């Protein structure tokens, strides 16, 4: 939420945990736009915008390989990229859902839950394909069979711990699965939230993450 406020010039309360989802918009400064505006004198200048969605802390039981579901899943599926913030600072006045501070565990839990959600999506899609193949003529099965082969290959890699973003997929394969709502295919940045007393060890902490 602190990063959300900084990016959107917002003032969302960061003192405690909230189940509320926050959405904010930030304009993207671009000197090129200013140059063009001075040249062509348009009636209106509209800079690019980035919409940020600040999700609440993971729900209770998160990290127990259940996969992400419900509103939490819908919110993550709706964004183009992910920024995961994990806590490394110690402060007894700020509670943690798991009661202990372990940023590596928290990051791994999030990645694991995204993977399990993707596997769940794959299983449901593969089941529909298998059922559909029974109704399709042999000569018409080519495209459906190719999709099945692709999804099985993706699932095998996910089960081996390889996120979709790290799998070697052709551009046409990426287009084929673009509407499925997979989470582990999204670009991802991980940020570790440290305390002032940890500044000297920030590089070592970054390497761990």
Question: What annotation goes with each model-predicted range?
Answer:
Residues 51-53, 80-87, 103-127, 150-166, ...:
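Conserved beta-strand/loop subsegment of P-loop NTPase cores
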Residues 1-4, 128-209:
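C-terminal-of-GTPase-core extension/linker across diverse P-loop GTPases
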């Amino acid at each position: 939420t602190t990063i959300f406020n900084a990016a959107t010039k917002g003032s969302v309360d960061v003192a405690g945990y909230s189940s509320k989802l926050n959405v904010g918009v930030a304009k993207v400064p671009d000197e090129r736009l200013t140059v063009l505006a001075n040249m062509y004198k348009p009636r209106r200048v509209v800079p690019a915008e980035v919409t940020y969605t600040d999700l609440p802390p993971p729900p209770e039981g998160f990290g127990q390989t259940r996969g992400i579901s419900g509103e939490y899943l819908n919110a993550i599926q709706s964004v183009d990229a992910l920024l995961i913030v994990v806590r490394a600072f110690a402060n007894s006045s700020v509670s943690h859902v798991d009661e202990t501070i372990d940023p590596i565990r928290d990051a791994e839990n999030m990645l694991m839950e995204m993977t399990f959600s993707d596997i769940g999506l794959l299983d449901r899609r593969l089941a529909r394909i298998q059922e559909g193949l029974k109704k399709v003529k042999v000569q018409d099965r080519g495209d459906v069979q190719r999709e099945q082969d692709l999804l099985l290959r993706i699932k095998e890699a996910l089960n081996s711990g390889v996120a979709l973003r790290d799998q070697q997929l052709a551009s046409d394969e990426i287009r084929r699965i673009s509407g499925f709502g997979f989470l582990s295919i999204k670009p991802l940045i991980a940020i570790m939230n440290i305390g002032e007393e940890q500044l000297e060890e920030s590089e070592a902490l970054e390497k761990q993450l």
